[in-house]
Amino acid sequence: MLAEALPWLQHFRDKIVVVKYGGNAMVDDSLKAAFAADMVFLRTVGAKPVVVHGGGPQISDMLRRVGLEGEFKGGFRVTTPEVMEIVRMVLFGQVGRDLVGLINSHGPYAVGTSGEDAGLFTAEKRLVDIDGTPTDIGLVGNIVNVDATSLMDLIDAGRIPVVSTIAPGADGQVYNINADTAAGALASAIGAERLLVLTNVEGLYTDWPNKSSLVSKIVASELDAILPGLDAGMIPKMESCLNAVRGGVNAAHVIDGRIAHSVLLELLTMGGIGTMVLPDNYAREDYPEGTVFRKNYQDGHA
């Protein structure tokens, strides 16, 4: 098995891989441990992993505990100043710290950071489309600038950054940022080789829940064309992948985080396990020889 992975191990040496950590992988203890081990494995073989995480389930749980209403509109959490206090506390103080601890059980690799630290992210308020109307749902933001100087110092020192997606605005407010969006923006800004997004499904279904509509490879223009019709929960994930490959990332992957070691299975095996999004002008020689695409988008859409 390891000998078969050699072309991929060589390919990812000294390359940055941004992983958006979410879904079941961040609530199941055995999956959390497997994910942490995957990050250490990548670092040990010479890749440069960077983790970006959300914390939806943990935030909802804490809001319930303190008696606050957790409300979503247009797929985004309504973020009042009171909710923002909880978001900030849970993301950086709980979810991020837990993952840093799991990774560091293997050695002193991980460092927790956030979009607020050393100006990593700058945000502005995001209006959310609800039935065609741009709507203010509180302290929800879009990233308008990435300054990765301090993050690159961590990466170059051999650390694994674990990034919480909260960010200051020029207006002095702190904003809650969708973690899928943040991961894509960061991957482009730091010249990542790959972006991986963990989900609770096998990959991209073009006609959810029709199992035969799962695709292994899709190029940016094909994804752009079908994006508005995708399942609502999948749109921010696929939009992040699309923006990443259009921003210079060689490929973006949506993978099933319910499978232990899904990151390694996707990156270091011939066919991978999820969906790979490629730039329109991708060159076959930029990807390890032996890479197999199980089902192209065109296969079902001649």
Swiss-Prot record:
Pathway membership: Amino-acid biosynthesis; L-arginine biosynthesis; N(2)-acetyl-L-ornithine from L-glutamate: step 2/4
Record-listed E.C. numbers: 2.7.2.8
Pfam families registered for this protein in UniProt: AA_kinase (PF00696)
GO cellular component: cytoplasm
Site (Transition state stabilizer) location in chain: 20, 237
InterPro entries, per the entry: AceGlu_kinase-like_sf (IPR036393), AcgluKinase_fam (IPR004662), ArgB (IPR037528), Asp/Glu/Uridylate_kinase (IPR001048), Glu/AcGlu_kinase (IPR001057), NAGK-C (IPR041727)
Assigned keywords, A-Z: Amino-acid biosynthesis, Arginine biosynthesis, ATP-binding, Cytoplasm, Kinase, Nucleotide-binding, Transferase
Gene3D superfamilies in UniProt: Acetylglutamate kinase-like
Subcellular localization, as worded in the UniProt entry: Cytoplasm
CDD domains linked: AAK_NAGK-C
Plastid among keywords: no
Domain of life: Bacteria
Catalytic activity reported: N-acetyl-L-glutamate + ATP = N-acetyl-L-glutamyl 5-phosphate + ADP
Binding site for substrate: 55-56, 77, 176
A biological-process GO annotation: arginine biosynthetic process via ornithine
GO MF: acetylglutamate kinase activity; ATP binding
Family: Belongs to the acetylglutamate kinase family. ArgB subfamily.
PANTHER family named in the record: N-ACETYLGLUTAMATE SYNTHASE, N-ACETYLGLUTAMATE SYNTHASE, MITOCHONDRIAL
Role noted for this protein: Catalyzes the ATP-dependent phosphorylation of N-acetyl-L-glutamate.
Protein's UniProt name: Acetylglutamate kinase
Highest classification ranks of the organism: Bacteria, Bacillati, Actinomycetota, Actinomycetes, Mycobacteriales
Chain's gene name: argB
